[in-house]
Amino acid sequence: MAACRALKAVLVDLSGTLHIEDAAVPGAQEALKRLRGTSVIVRFVTNTTKESKQDLLERLRKLEFDISEDEIFTSLTAARSLLEQKQVRPMLLVDDRALPDFKGIQTTDPNAVVMGLAPEHFHYQILNQAFRLLLDGAPLIAIHKARYYKRKDGLALGPGPFVTALEYATDTKATVVGKPEKTFFLEALRGTGCEPEEAVMIGDDCRDDVGGAQDVGMLGILVKTGKYRASDEEKINPPPYLTCESFPHAVDHILQHLL
């Protein structure tokens, strides 16, 4: 971050950073209140494809997070924008709870494949239908390619391995719309009036959250909650600006050293 520029915006990952399923990270609500007590703009960015933005917002409010819908930017939003730009009819491999975010999108006689995290759809018959569409020239759109994510019972496969399987089988390359894509972070910052060099990203994924943000010029703070595993910070170059225990510790650092 350029020394002459003050911090103006903080982007915060949700799952694994503020909460894990229906449990908040300890101290996260109070830390968010402290961050909001400053002059920085706060936005929430997520690759979740398991639920619509409205369902996600309701989950966060039940956990007593003070968040409004217009502060959340999701990879589902980015995927819908791309579908509208391309004017294609997608085969939607997403969780049924995410379908409201695609309301109005024509899906009959599909000529594109959209993949999110949808364990109930990831079986041979459905994946083979997607495979055949791709062989016929349909574009493959990956909402994100996370390798795994954190559940209460442990780590679980993300959509990335399934996207990669279809890429391999069809000799094609998916268009990825979520983190760590540069366009995702730039779109999340749009409307804040902030440049990437004036922003910080806080997340539990060293590649998708921290690496992606730092690639566009932001500072990246990696938290050791959610999907974090020992030595994750050594997997990207440059390494995270900071690695700390949790979101409250990240906020402490911001308040003490970046404002």
Curated annotation (Swiss-Prot):
InterPro entries, A to Z: HAD-like_sf, HAD-SF_hydro_IIA, HAD_sf, LHPP/HDHD2
Protein's UniProt keywords contain Coiled coil: yes
MF GO annotations: enzyme binding; metal ion binding; phosphatase activity
GO CC aspect terms: cytoplasm
N6-succinyllysine sites (modified residues): K50
Binding site for substrate: D13, L14, S15, T46, N47, K179
Record CDD domains: HAD_PPase (cd07509)
Cofactor binding description: Binds 1 Mg(2+) ion per subunit.
Cofactors, names only: Mg(2+)
Keywords: Coiled coil, Magnesium, Metal-binding
Entry coiled-coil feature ranges: 47-71
Binding site for Mg(2+): D13, S15, D204
Keyword Coiled coil found: yes
UniProt xrefs under PANTHER family: 4-NITROPHENYLPHOSPHATASE-RELATED, HALOACID DEHALOGENASE-LIKE HYDROLASE DOMAIN-CONTAINING PROTEIN 2
NCBIfam families per UniProt: HAD-SF-IIA, HAD-SF-IIA-hyp3
Family: Belongs to the HAD-like hydrolase superfamily.
Protein name listed in UniProt: Haloacid dehalogenase-like hydrolase domain-containing protein 2
Native source species: Pongo abelii
Gene designation: HDHD2
